[in-house]
Swiss-Prot record:
This is Fructose import ATP-binding protein FruK. Keywords: ATP-binding, Cell membrane, Membrane, Nucleotide-binding, Repeat, Sugar transport, Translocase, Transport. It catalyses: D-fructose(out) + ATP + H2O = D-fructose(in) + ADP + phosphate + H(+). Part of the high-affinity ABC transporter complex FruEKFG involved in fructose uptake. Can also transport ribose and xylose, with lower affinity. Probably responsible for energy coupling to the transport system. The complex is composed of an ATP-binding protein (FruK), two transmembrane proteins (FruF and FruG) and a solute-binding protein (FruE). One of its GO terms (molecular function) is ATP hydrolysis activity. It comes from the Bacteria. Its EC number is 7.5.2.-.
């Protein structure tokens, strides 16, 4: 493959923001007919590198060559004119237009009286057919097809401009296995036509299935370029995060189960807590310094129980005892006042506030508990923000950067920092490691253990059973909106234990099915 002339050569790319060097002398070379993965943990510089190649960011140093010609992109149009097309995780198409109109947008066929829509849709059909998408009618409204199909339409649109380079940024994050298979079939067609594909994904299985070559970044620096087939997974992980896979596997490995002393009272003790149509009545107790895992399949009631504990949803049954006193946690404000915090599973829509800075996102919940007419003094605010950015290793270390410009893992850290700033006694974390890379995931798992060791009660909700088992002292197992078991975690408990419990328990009787 290396006997081909490269389509793109990026050398010594450096991009600086105020007080932060996002990229520091990074190289990237893309070859025709290859799928090339850009690898690195969240915050490594992958998105910044893509934005340099697509003209979103101007580079401070370095050079970009496309087809042997030096390029200086002053915007995305310059990059498109050079043959670089991008399909983002959130497809940037016009849902009010048809499939064909989206494919040909900006390249419509014209006649003597303006756009010839018949010829435009015929041309769109041709481009769709070239990619094996003959089944899609170009007249179909884009809004009526799935996200997966919309991504394929976006790729067809890239082919209209005769793209030399196709950038796919996390295209599989919302796809099921069949949709991923269809996407990969299209990617292979595009690759075999001579296009260079730059692929970004945090799914290692997919990386090893579809890519030919890897470039690894870490902390904004170039680490290495390797061939995928020659690179063991543990070696790749080590290059991405600066730690070996063996080191990561030790997180939680020596964790002793938190033993409850006789007469000790829980932080939270709920009896028969439920909400009709949401989750059946549940008993749960959570002690100081204890990690309680909520495990179950999608729709089991994990999130619903977490929301009831926080007051995000109002229960219609049960009692709630907090530090030995009966309370009514009926809304999030009351929960915060009682030192209960909840980090949502949907961090983008319900968690972070993208247009606000890192500083503002960390401070907003604490300010809410004090009231808007009692602003946090600047010296105190600076100390709080600095403390949690350092403790959680938020990168880039720029508190005045809009949080939407951070990677997913760093956004999650900011969200956790927001709740830690309120000094909770109970922290409910719903899917805190979803959609982030292995390095950030390991950091957040370690944070959970550290918080528990400091005496905080933690509810850990995750669809990844392995991390529930690794981190939890007790595991509440849910199925079909019922609590079906409580497992005291020890060396005999594994993912298989939970799976067997779910598979073999009748939700109505609580006994083996």
């Amino acid at each position: 493959m290396t006997d081909k002339n490269p389509i793109v050569v990026m050398k010594g790319i450096t991009i600086e923001f105020p007080g932060v060097k996002a990229l520091d002398g990074v190289d990237l070379t893309l070859y025709p007919g290859e799928v090339h993965a850009l690898m690195g943990e969240n915050g490594a510089g992958k998105s910044t590198m893509i934005k340099a190649l697509t003209g979103v960011y101007k580079i401070n140093a370095g050079s970009i060559m496309v087809d042997g010609k030096p390029q200086q992109f002053n915007g995305t149009l310059d990059a498109q004119n050079a043959g670089i097309a991008t399909v983002y995780q959130e497809v940037n198409l016009c849902t009010n237009l048809s499939v064909g109109e989206n494919v040909m947008l900006g390249h419509e066929k014209r006649g003597p009286f303006g756009i010839d829509w018949k010829k435009t849709h015929e041309a769109a059909k041709k481009y769709l057919a070239q990619m094996g998408l003959e089944s899609i009618d170009p007249h179909t409204p884009l809004s009526s097809i799935s996200i997966a199909m919309q991504q394929l339409v976006a790729i067809a649109r890239a082919m209209v401009i005769n793209a030399k380079v196709l950038i796919l940024d996390e295209p599989t994050s919302s796809l099921d296995a069949n949709e991923v298979r269809d996407l990969f079939a299209i990617m292979r067609k595009v690759r075999d036509s001579g296009v260079a594909i730059l692929f970004v994904s945090h799914f290692l299985d997919q990386i090893y299935e579809i890519t030919d070559r890897l470039t690894i970044l870490r902390n904004g620096q170039f680490i290495k370029e390797v061939m995928t087939k020659d690179t063991p997974r543990d070696e790749l992980i080590g290059m991405m995060i600066g730690k070996s896979a063996a080191e990561l596997s030790q997180i939680g490995a020596k964790k002793a189960r938190r033993e409850i002393t006789p007469g000790e009272k829980p932080i939270v003790d709920v009896k028969g807590l439920g909400k009709k149509g949401t989750i059946n009545p549940v008993d749960v107790d959570i002690y100081k310094g204890e990690v309680v895992g909520f495990a179950g399949l999608l729709g089991s009631g994990r999130t619903e129980l977490g929301r009831l504990l926080y007051g995000a949803d109002k229960p219609d049954s049960g009692t709630y005892t907090l530090n030995g006193k009966k309370v009514n946690i009926s809304d999030p404000y009351t929960a915060l006042k009682n030192k209960i915090a909840y980090s949502t599973e949907n961090r983008r829509d319900e968690g972070i506030i993208g247009d606000l800075t890192v500083r503002q996102n960390i401070l907003i919940a604490l300010q809410a508990t004090r009231g808007m007419f009692k602003p946090i003094p600047k010296k105190e605010a600076d100390a709080i923000v600095d403390k949690y950015m350092k403790e959680l290793n938020v990168r880039p270390a720029d508190p005045d950067r809009p949080v939407k410009n951070l990677s997913g893992g760093n956004q999650q850290k900011v969200l956790i920092g927001r709740w830690l700033a309120t000094h909770p006694e109970l922290l409910i974390l719903d899917e805190p490691t979803r959609g982030i890379d292995i390095g950030a995931k390991a950091e957040i798992q370690q944070v959970v253990l550290d918080l528990a060791s400091q005496g905080m009660g933690v509810v850990f909700i995750s669809s990844e059973l392995e991390e529930v088992v690794r981190l939890s002292d007790d595991i509440e197992v849910l199925k079909d909106r019922h609590k079906i078991a409580e497992i005291e975690n020890d060396d005999t408990v594994s993912q298989a234990t939970i799976v067997e419990t779910i598979a073999n328990t009748n939700v109505n009787t609580g006994k083996e099915a």
